[in-house]
Amino acid sequence: KIPLTEKSELLWIPVVVNGKSYDFILDTGASFTMISQDLAKDMGATIIGDPVFVGGGESTGGYGQRAFIENMNVGPVSLKNVIAFVSENPTDDDPLKVDAVLGMDFIERAGEIQIDLAAMTLIIPAQTTALPASGRNIILETNIPVVESTDANGNRYTFILDTGASGANLSDLWFAKNAEVAAALPVETQNVWGHGGTVQLEIVKVPEFKLTIGTSSAEFKDLPATVPANGTVSSSRDGRLGMGLLKQFSKVIFNFEDMFVAFE
């Protein structure tokens, strides 16, 4: 069991590099592990190659270099020769001051992780959980989990499962599919932060939204839905489910061997 702490509504996990412990955000919405320039220096990580483009959640993304970390320990899991992306140091307008993200390159390698929100621990079980009767419900897209769900009317939707997002939201694709309902709601402006800075979006707030994943149901109030910019849909999925979903349960199981997520 690895202790988790909650800060700015996100889950942080201790990662040991060269005998020193650092707090990383546990982030299924990040394809790769990421560290800031200052942290890379502090860890003694070796910078390799030229800068590469790194996507950034809802934001524009940005360029980062890659760093070679010889040894990294997350609880009982020891990783050797880790390649992490190096981002610019957090800016003053970064609300989270994030300088370390543990991404899907590690999480997927664990096979299964269980996030016990009641005990605030992360469990990497010796034996993985059996596939539930409801079957597989996630796929990996650019190494990020996408989950299948249905709403209260039986409509099928797919969402990015992102533990690095504090809430949940509906995308411009969902808006376009539900234009009649969505267009009747008042438009607001919302600032969204991601790697690469802050982006301003036009949104509407859906007063009540229920969805079912497998055999578990969740309910959201005033869920933001992005208005398509200039009438153009840019999302390929119906939204992003973050801690706003996870916190409705006491335990969440991510199994990347049988490709399912289950909630208790």
Regions found by a protein language model. Give the residues of each.
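Pepsin/retropepsin-fold aspartyl endopeptidases
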Residues: 1-264
